[in-house]
Design a protein with these regions (language model features):
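Bacterial Sec-dependent N-terminal signal peptides
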Residues: 1-27
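Accessory carbohydrate-recognition regions in carbohydrate-active enzymes
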Residues: 25-360, 364-408, 414-467, 478-501, ...
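ATP-dependent phospho-/nucleotidyl transfer catalytic cores
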Residues: 472
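Short acidic, glycine-rich surface-loop motifs adjacent to enzyme active sites
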Residues: 475
Length: 733
């Protein structure tokens, strides 16, 4: 009875503000978590993690199999056979590393060891993960470890087969790092306090990607009979502690950890609100119900493998952004001040260069109750640091990637009718972001003087910075126009045409240009650029991949090529010419097209906008067949905070937001036979692919609510009104 009550209570919480959803939505009859495999993407370049978390939660408690080097951005590789321990925070699918806070490791036997001698082998057959739950049995320790989570707290359950010196290592020096030197020097300060024989509190400040402060409270279900600190290396400031317990063989020790950015009292309040007791099964059941309350918003027909791919994508997309404010709405902002979040919740982990493309459009459609909170968080941070977040993490800015696609995310929300934020504040943040230069990422004086970022005056990524900034200018113009700001709209609309200044008609590429107006030479359109390693004028890409980065004005881009035929000929070459140089995060290749990296994600849909929708439909099927699978290596590139997953979901339904701010989803071809989207206010939108098969991959015709539909896109407004979209599939082009 208790489990049922927790299940229903959590469903209510998960659906709060998701106004009056359908009865089926409120009490899902299907356990959709059965179709989620958290191990998908946990091998090779996917960089996902298999541990326990809640939708948009602050906590992601997960195993660590490594922490040094790019392959361990999520601290886990599926092929590894040694577990270092379990940390409480993780990034999902990123190409850079941070978090990995508070490593804990249960063990038995000798307690005094070197810091790296507490690790244990494990059998893959003992490892299992579902949304909100992870378990594994540690061979040397002979401990069964189980993890579950709430929004702000992790709950661990360790069953000790042996009771000889049953202990837990608590490592506050640990965290993912680029190299061994950084691993042993990333902590700037660390304080801990044993408040009683079962409670440890503390504060850690560290720096890998951002300057991070976290406060914690850790409690144990058994009294600690002895504890001591391990010696630290010369560059280390993070403490490592060992806590021991007096238990019998087969007995359990539970441990709960709550985090806060504001202080120990904030962490204690979070724990008291979310994990007041030791009901592991209750929290686990509530976590499952929480995930079901979201996953049930889309009903999918298809094979079990297809459902696994789809619902795992749904799961990955909802791991972030993360609610890092306390239960009372307070958080530590970018100026290190503790403040109240506008709207009561502050979110971070905004991988905006990735997620503005499809993940945020997906949130506006399927998680609309969170969108205003995301926008308020972006604007709150902008008012502290004077520009919208570029890549927001733990409430701070890490300056990763180019341009500032917080502009797009804010403008898209406004264009789609979201009004739970102050539009004047939001537009002021956009205007300041796009006009006031700041270190590292924007020199608007050069941009306005030349109409592009000159390669000789820009350290790296000049072409990508121009093209990506142009899209944000378009987004700013769109919001200004909708708000009646005529002068601002005209100003940003003029800048939105700057992409034309980098098009070299002789080569038909977007090409780096110098401040004197001449093209940079020599020029190799296949040469991959990467600011942090090889430099160059492109961001994790090349001229072949970035020439198509004009999401807001495809007709204008086609005109630069001289019409649809030369445009399509060049686009054909993209998918057939072999890439000459490689980069770790430029993957999922079909010719020069790189599905494993975000600038390519809209490109297949350009065929549909240039009069050849059948080629879009062929390529979507090829990408589904070759770049996604329900396996640990089933993602061809970094999931990038759910963007790879969001592309899959949109494309599976048969459309994609080429230009997110426009609110238009360009048609491709559906890959599963039926979807039912449970929208806000009890509405449903049904998508059917009649006649879909391996051969029938082309769309013959479309109807919307029984009427013939001839547009090459469907609008966000039409979807959220509810209705039925039917594709008639055929094997004929």
């Amino acid at each position: 009875m208790k489990k049922l009550s927790v299940f229903l209570y959590t469903l209510a919480l998960g659906s709060a503000f998701y106004s009056c959803s359908t009865a089926k939505q409120d009490t899902p009859q299907t356990d959709y978590t059965q179709y989620v495999d958290p191990f998908i993407g946990a091998a090779d370049n996917g960089h996902t993690f298999p541990g326990a978390c809640r939708p948009f939660g602050m906590i992601q408690t997960s195993p660590v199999t490594g922490a040094v080097g790019w392959r361990y951005c999520s601290e886990y590789m599926y092929a590894d056979s040694i577990i270092w321990g379990f940390t409480q925070t993780h990034l999902n699918g990123t190409g850079c590393m941070d978090l990995g806070d508070i490593l804990v490791m249960p063990f038995t036997g000798e307690r005094h060891r070197t810091w790296d001698a507490y690790r244990s082998s494990f059998s893959k057959t003992s490892e299992n993960a579902t949304p909100g739950y992870y378990t594994v049995t540690l061979d040397q320790a002979k401990v069964k470890a189980e993890l579950t989570a709430t929004t702000h707290a992790a709950l661990h359950r360790y069953t000790y087969e042996q009771a000889d010196s049953a202990s837990i290592l608590i490592d506050l020096q640990h965290g993912p790092a680029w190299n061994e030197k950084q691993y042993h020097s990333q902590v700037n300060s660390c304080e801990v306090n044993w408040e009683n024989d079962s409670t440890l509190t503390g504060h850690v400040n560290n720096k890998v990607w951002v300057d991070q402060d976290y406060y914690f409270v850790m409690q144990f279900s058994h009294p600690v009979i002895d504890h001591f600190e391990l010696p630290m290396a010369e560059t280390e400031k993070g403490k490592r502690l060992v806590a021991s317990f007096n238990i019998q063989p087969g007995e359990e020790v539970l441990m709960k950890v709550a985090l806060s950015t504001t202080g120990v009292e904030g962490a204690k309040a979070n724990m008291a609100a979310e994990v007041p007791g030791w009901d592991f099964e209750g929290i686990r059941t509530a976590a499952k119900a929480d995930w079901n309350s979201y996953l049930s918003r889309i009903e999918v027909e298809g094979t079990d493998e297809e459902k696994t791919n789809f619902y795992t994508s749904f799961y990955h997309a909802l791991i972030q952004p993360n609610e890092i404010s306390d239960v009372d709405g307070r958080y530590r902002n970018a100026a290190d001040s503790v403040v109240n979040a506008t709207g009561g919740k502050f979110y971070s982990t905004f991988s905006l260069w990735d997620t503005y493309r499809a993940a945020h459009p997906f949130y506006t459609l399927m998680v609309p109750e969170r969108v205003d909170g995301f926008i308020n968080s972006l604007v709150d941070q902008a008012e502290v640091q004077d520009y919208l977040p570029i890549w927001g993490l733990w409430g701070k800015e890490n300056f990763c990637m180019v341009a500032n696609h917080g502009v797009s995310v804010v403008a898209e929300a406004y264009a789609k009718g979201f009004r739970g934020f102050d539009a004047e504040r939001a537009f002021n943040a956009i205007k300041q972001t796009q006009t006031v230069s700041h270190p590292l990422k924007s020199n608007w004086e050069n941009y306005m003087k030349y109409g592009y970022f000159p390669t000789d005056l820009t350290e790296a990524e000049s072409v990508s910075s121009t093209l990506e900034s142009v899209y944000d200018d378009y987004a700013a113009a769109d919001m200004a126009k909708r708000m009646g700001k005529t002068e601002d709209a005209a100003y940003f609309a003029r800048r939105a045409d700057f992409y034309k200044n980098l098009f070299d008609s002789s080569t038909q590429f977007m090409r780096p240009k110098k401040s004197d107006g001449t093209w940079k030479s020599p020029f190799n359109p296949s040469q991959i650029g990467h600011a942090e390693s090889v430099g160059g004028d492109y961001t994790e890409g090349n001229a072949w991949q970035y020439t198509w980065h004009v999401q807001h004005d495809v007709p204008g881009l086609i005109a630069l090529f001289g019409g649809e035929e030369p445009f399509l000929n060049k686009l054909d070459s993209l998918f057939t010419l072999k890439l000459e140089t490689t980069q770790a995060d430029v993957t999922g290749l079909i010719g020069q097209y790189a599905h494993g990296n975000e600038p390519s994600h809209h490109v297949t849909y350009l065929y549909a906008l240039a009069g050849r929708p059948e080629r879009t439909q062929e390529l979507i099927r090829e990408i589904f067949d070759t770049q996604y699978s329900p396996k640990p290596n089933g993602l061809c590139g970094n999931d990038d905070c759910g963007q790879m997953s969001a592309w899959y979901m949109f494309s599976a339904m048969g459309f994609y937001p080429v230009n997110p701010v426009s609110g238009e989803y360009v048609f491709g071809a559906p890959q599963l036979p039926e979807f039912v989207l449970h929208l806000a206010d009890g509405k449903t939108f049904t998508i059917k692919a009649e006649g879909l098969s391996e051969a029938n991959k082309y769309v013959k015709s479309i109807t919307l609510n029984g009427e013939p539909y001839t547009k090459n896109f469907i609008s966000h407004a039409d979807i959220v009104k509810g209705g039925t979209l039917v594709y008639q599939m055929t094997d004929k082009k």
